[in-house]
Amino acid sequence: MAFTAAEKSVIVQEFQRAPGDTGSPEVQVALLTNRINYLTPHFVKHKKDFHSRRGLLRLVNQRRKLLDYLKNTDNERYRTLIERLGLRK
């Protein structure tokens, strides 16, 4: 796995909306972003690893869908999350 349970719990605590919240879009997007950032350097070294690239694209698409959902339901939370994660320029 990309990161340990301790690292995962730190991310959850940072982005949770209420104590024990692990399912909110903010937490899910933050965890996916962490996994994406962990996997991305692998593809600089291994340009032809298409099998793993497919998994990375799956994660990116899942994050995009969650961000689209958040943008459509609560635009202010979306903008705050984008700013905190540094996803858009």
UniProtKB/Swiss-Prot annotation:
Signal peptide: none annotated. GO terms for molecular function: rRNA binding; structural constituent of ribosome. One of its GO terms (cellular component) is cytosolic small ribosomal subunit. InterPro entries: Ribosomal_uS15, Ribosomal_uS15_bac-type, uS15_NS1_RNA-bd_sf. The keyword rRNA-binding applies. GO terms for biological process: translation. This is Small ribosomal subunit protein uS15. It comes from Methylococcus capsulatus (strain ATCC 33009 / NCIMB 11132 / Bath).
